[in-house]
Amino acid sequence: MGGAGLTSRARLVKGVTAVVAAVLASMGLASATGADPVIGGKTVLKPDRDTFEGLADMSIGVEATGAATFRRSGAKFPIKGGDVKGGPKGSIEHRGGLAFFTEGGPGVKFSKFTIRIGKRKVKLFAKSGRSEVRFLDLDLGDATIGGSEGVKLRIKGADAGLAKQGAEVLSDVFDFPFRKGIPVGVVNVKAQLG
């Protein structure tokens, strides 16, 4: 009899748990993080003219790779996923990347960009070779952040500088002392949430 009572109680707890989960899901509170999935959009990097002219003077070219494209407005990277919550905080994943190269000489590719928005810092990570490296640091100090909660996120005018790991990779490949903080350009993000 005690076993039957325990089974009934277990079923009751299981049933109540399922009802609570359904209610939370209908309220959009099922996720512990309260984050909205990122379902599309684009990020554009408008190159820093002085830095890219300096690269050209060193005979280092830069081109978009994969799904990324280079236009007059800058390099465009399609957004493929991620999660973002209020603040904003979260991550935004991209397709495509950038290749740095010399004609007939060494080169390196940074791809699969992920922007990670933290409480105090915003970092752009990329795959280089078989490793993930912190490629750029983004400064939101002078940026404009807007959008509609749960619908879209807009970040306009984030200054992008070369991160320490990104500088180390470029230094190793091109045998030149690239330094952390070199201006790379201005980043604009238009992310669709769903």
Q: How should each PLM-predicted stretch be described?
A:
Residues K46-D48, R116, D139:
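Poly-acidic low-complexity segments
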Residues E132-Q165:
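Extended amphipathic ligand-handling, pore-lining, and cofactor/metal-binding catalytic surfaces
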Residues A4, K119, L193-G194:
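Solvent-exposed, well-ordered amphipathic alpha-helical segments
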Residues A32-K89, D159-G194:
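N-terminal segment immediately downstream of the Sec signal-peptide cleavage site
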Residues G2-T33:
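Secretory targeting and sorting signals
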Residues A18, L24, G28, D57, ...:
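Generic alpha-helix signal with a bias toward terminal, lower-confidence helices
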Residues T65-R134:
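Predominantly extracellular/secreted and cell-surface proteins with exposed
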